[in-house]
A protein has these predicted regions:
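A conserved short beta-strand
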Residues: 90-102
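Conserved alpha/beta-hydrolase "acid-adjacent" motif
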Residues: 17, 126-132
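Catalytic histidine neighborhood in serine/cysteine hydrolases
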Residues: 34-36, 138-153
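Conserved alpha/beta-hydrolase fold motif
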Residues: 71-72, 94
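Post-His helix in hydrolase/transferase enzymes
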Residues: 54, 154-169
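Active-site loop->helix "elbow" adjoining a glycine-rich segment at hydrolase catalytic centers
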Residues: 75-79
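Serine-hydrolase catalytic machinery in alpha/beta-hydrolase-like enzymes
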Residues: 2-69, 81-84
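Short beta-strand/loop motif that positions the catalytic acidic residue
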Residues: 113, 119-121, 125
Length: 175
């Protein structure tokens, strides 16, 4: 029996087998959650920011087909589309790594459902200033963990995986 379903969305110029997404998938499986990792690679070839609306459409389709409690998780652009889609589907939580509050050239700023949300972001993120994420998370009172790392959170993959496992357990306690 699975506790729920996790959809893990990779960042731009990444893929479904990327290090962070793979680490989270392993934690989901070990924790009794089914999971999937949509491949946005072909969509992302559309340009600097890829086709964000096509990413959203694919994630929405996958989320609507999911059974049981749904958690959306993502890194960078994957976090952005996960947050946006969370407002359109029934979702029990969000796990966002390095989420951009805005993406230049995209008309929609970051918005998310009012569900339990955990954000991990790097103090030294070279693409998304930590203060921008603090400013976005503060009025929502989301849990925000700032780590001594850059945008890829490369030095904190295991840390992110542990936080994700703890987050899954906390969601289960509330279901």
């Amino acid at each position: 029996m699975t506790h729920g379903h996790v959809i893990l969305s990779h960042g731009l110029h990444s893929g479904p087998n990327a290090t962070k997404v793979s680490a989270l998938a392993a934690v989901a499986a070990e924790s009794g959650w089914s999971h999937e990792r949509p491949d946005y690679s072909a969509i992302d070839r559309a340009g600097r920011c890829g086709d964000i609306d096509a990413r959203i459409a694919l994630l929405r389709e996958r989320a609507q087909a999911a059974r049981g409690p749904l958690l959306l998780a993502g890194s960078s652009m994957g976090a952005f589309v996960s947050a946006l889609v969370s407002r359109e589907v029934a979702c029990v939580g969000l796990f966002l790594m390095a989420p951009p509050p805005v993406i230049e050239g995209h008309p929609q700023a970051l918005v998310a459902a009012r569900v339990p949300t955990l954000i991990v972001h790097g103090w030294d993120d070279e693409l998304i200033p930590a203060q921008a994420v603090i400013d976005w998370a503060q009025p929502r009172r989301d849990r925000l963990i700032l780590v001594d790392d850059g945008h890829r959170l490369a030095a904190h993959v295991d840390f992110c995986a542990r936080q994700f496992g703890d987050f899954l357990r906390s969601l289960l306690a509330g279901l």
